[in-house]
Amino acid sequence: MGKENLYVWEMTPGMVHENDAAERLLALCGQENMLRSETKEGKIELTAACDGLFRVDSQRLIAVNSREDVMIATRKGNTAVRKGDKLAGMRVIPLIIKEETLQAAEQAAGAGPLLELLPYVKKTAAIVATGSEVKKGLIQDTFTPVVKEKLAAYGIETISIAYSGDGVENVANAIGEARKTGADLILCTGGMSVDPDDNTPGGIQASGARIVTYGAPVLPGAMFLLGYFEDGTPICGLPGCVMYAGATIFDLALPRIAAGVELTRRDFAVMGEGGLCLGCKPCHWPNCPFGK
């Protein structure tokens, strides 16, 4: 072992061994849809048991990690993970820790798990491709295939594609027909800019959706729109950058939407920090700072 001395630890009242302490830290994290490792050298790790959205209660995690002699490290929250991905690791710093110190960490954690892994629940989507030039066949629809591929990565099947043309009424009517398909998610492509004939935002509003945000502090993707219908069905207006950029606001929002999380305006506001794509060549998304 390379050691001149061997040490024997004897149980002392009021002290907790690192292995037992790690189990208690694990209990704070939660394990639904996650798999734990064996306790090794005082450390336990969590991995994903399914594809889904990994979420972290950041403020409570900070509260725990602010206590003395304990640590829980996680991957970034609100990110998509695959089955088998590493999610978190936890341990205490010393070999043995005071019971009162461990209890202080438990109290700081409060009620409920610090971590959660939400499986994707949205299974079907309907796409409304706007623009008269697409409807008339003057240009090829290169937007829809990109969106379908992004949806498929989260297990979402595209069950309907409609070409609305221009005009608020035309877009609204096409959205109404898309809703009749029973799709879990509706996506409108194009027509999201400031030109007079960009009527997609108006069409979405006219369709009866409650608009959460039109615009987001993310580049590329500033002209993104998200709304919800009364039954909870989300609808997105996708700007043209989704068609050609490696990663956009849609890639940040889609995992949450697919997991059934209802986003708020504040959710988008906090995306501003880290919301600037650096345009790296080649693109390394999602292994990059964008959206982190």
Language model features by range: what are they?
Residues 111-166, 170:
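Glycine-rich phosphate/diphosphate-binding loop of Rossmann-like nucleotide-binding domains
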Residues 25, 99-115:
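Short, compositionally biased
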Residues 30-32, 72-75, 108-115, 174:
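Glycine-rich, charged/polar anion/phosphate-binding loops
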Residues 4-7, 34-36, 43-45, 85-88, ...:
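Structural motif
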Residues 36-39, 79-81, 116-121, 179-180, ...:
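Solvent-exposed alpha-helices and their adjacent loops that cap or buttress functional pockets
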Residues 1-100:
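Phosphate-interaction motifs
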Residues 132, 159-291:
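Short glycine/threonine-rich loop/turn motifs
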Residues 3-4, 27-34, 51, 83-86, ...:
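Generic secondary-structure signature for well-ordered alpha-helical cores
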